[in-house]
Amino acid sequence: MQNLRKRTYKQHGFTLIELMVAVSIFFFVIAAIYESFLSQQHVSFIQAQVSDMQQNARLAMGFLSKEIRMAGFGMPATEVNGFSNAITPAIDNNANGGNNVLIGTDQISIVTGYQQGSTLQSAASFDSTTITLVGNANLFNTTTKSFLYIDGVGLIDNYQVTGIAGNVLTVSPPLRRVYPAGASVLLVKAITYSVNDAMFLTRDENTGGGAQPLVPNIEDLQFAYQLNDGSWSNAPAVPGNIRAVRINVLARTSRQDPQWAGLGIRPANENHAAATVKDGYRRRLLTSVVAVRNLGL
């Protein structure tokens, strides 16, 4: 009989301590990866916020500088929707609240007619009281959109619309000269820019439609005015003496950054004092000086 021998096998595995060490290392690695992910996510979020903020500041500056530069162009001798100056400043608005203009911000109203509304379909005769447009006669009316001018080949003539029938406008006074077919007909507007309580840059054409929001997250808007004697004023007594405008647009991020808490503060801007309470918003201030082309000619 063969001898029965007991076979033994070498046992493999991990001890409890080894397993605990491995699990601890695993969780440390996962925590590091997660922390890195959160950090990258935060950086991406802030970069997106800052990018949007910078774009908003540039957009707001673009709207303002373009139309302020053209203030007074095509302006009639009479007032347009209550405005008789090419530029009408309004300083530190809404100190007492109630008009949906952000407290402490400035407001500016300009009269300009630089945008073409239509063209003449046919030549217009001297002393005629009507003109026929190619189209877009609905841009005009006899009340709030009644002032126009016709480009008379280097000569600008203002008229007021007194009647509309299709694309035929009745105007006053009678035409001062002959205008060729294709001559530009432009609507003169009174435009007011301000910042509302929701921190939107707004644009109001003062025709009854109210202020329309243009650009979000604009925290402050301030102006300074260079006068005909070269001096600067935040509140010029005679708007007709304005020759240039310094525009200051302060944009901020849409949300606070918890890691920036207590480091952000609205800065002083022209005659608007800095805020006294710190927060977590990031900000960007853009400043531009715009010469007004059509004043002082």
Can you say where each PLM-predicted feature lies in the sequence?
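Aliphatic-rich helix starts adjacent to a transmembrane/signal segment
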Residues: 2-4, 11-65, 69-71
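Short linear sequence signals and composition-biased patches located at protein termini or domain-edge surfaces
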Residues: 3-5, 11, 49-52, 56, ...
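Intrinsically disordered, low-complexity segments enriched in small/polar residues
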Residues: 7, 12, 32-35, 147, ...
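Intrinsically disordered, low-complexity segments enriched in polar/charged residues with Gly/Pro
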Residues: 15, 23, 37-40, 148, ...
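N-terminal start-of-chain detector that recognizes signal peptides
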Residues: 23-26, 33-36, 42, 73-79, ...
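Autoprocessing Asn-cyclization modules and mimics
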Residues: 89-180
